[in-house]
Amino acid sequence: MNGKQKILIADDSEINRALLMEILGDGYEYLEAENGVRAVELLREHTDIALVLLDIMMPQMDGFDVLKVMRCYSWLDEIPVIMISAAKDTANIERAYDLGVADYMRRPFERVMVLRQVQNVLMLYAKQKRLT
């Protein structure tokens, strides 16, 4: 083990996945999923995922359906999710929070916001785990 926290980036756009990895830098280990089905497969295979960056609109299974699977298996109790979308629709934002996301990130990405949101969510979940 390299000691780096593992982040699953689930987005059907290879460019968006690469951009997020470039913004976040070498301090993390990354897993990539191009659709929701692959995201669920990776969640089953890797029990040490620290964070999921999850796009809403993906083929085969969208981000909302991934969240439903995560709730079904109680993975949301252990793994925080930051939902990603270009949509400004508040209904999607509310639905994401209702399904259990820790935070919501809009595209286009702002470098400082991406870094801070990821750091804050990881820090808060680490503190929560220490308290339980």
Segments and roles (model prediction):
Residues 4, 47-50, 74-80:
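His-Asp phosphorelay/catalytic-motif detector in bacterial-type signaling
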Residues 32-51:
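Acidic, metal-coordinating helix/loop segments flanking the phosphotransfer/catalytic sites
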Residues 91, 109-118, 122:
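C-terminal output helix
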Residues 58-61:
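Receiver (REC) domain active-site loop signature in two-component systems and cognate sites
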Residues 2, 6, 13-32, 44:
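Two-component/phosphorelay signaling modules centered on CheY-like receiver
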